Amino acid sequence: MAVFIEKTLEGLKELLDERGQMKILGKEGTLNEVECQFFASATDQEITEFEKKLNVTLPEDYRVFLKTHNGARIYDVMIYGSNVGGGLHILSLKEIYESMQTIALLKPTFIPVAHLLDGCYLLIDKTKASTDPNYLWLLNQTEYEFLNLNFELFVDRYIVSQGANFWKWNLYSAENYYRTN
């Protein structure tokens, strides 16, 4: 499997100004100012210890991300120059441990790896992590939704769609879009 997540992240970084900010076009023509932050990489030892603690082999694309950045914030919303959060918060290994203790409805087969603006968590299915290329789920409050994606495809599409909930797009036809918005 060719892993391209580093290329996607480098492309995004090239679009950012010196403050890590940029303007993006949101749905229905909304112009938003956003900020991105990328944290220092995790070491091979930290990743291996994490895998041993959870008794899991992490997917290759997610391991590559961790070796590049042990966490990131993508498309945090800026209002009048102040970061008000939102966007995609890719958790560090430490934040994953903490989240596993605090997410009330988290099933033991899942590892939370990111948090989204609308209260959703992006999850790796431990039972599929080393055997199935489509191992990603979304936990939305109390409902689990299989995304039929891996980590790097999710991040790539999230960046290309400029932070939109792209996984819901196939649900909208012109007819039902205007009824719900």
PLM region spans:
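A surface-exposed partner-binding patch
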Residues: 1-121, 179
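Low-complexity, glycine/alanine/valine/leucine- and proline-rich hydrophobic stretches
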Residues: 121-128
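A recognition module on extended beta-rich or small alphabeta surfaces enriched in W/G with H and D/E
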Residues: 127, 135-170
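A short alpha->loop->secondary-structure connector
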Residues: 131
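Non-cytosolic coordination micro-motifs
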Residues: 154, 179-181
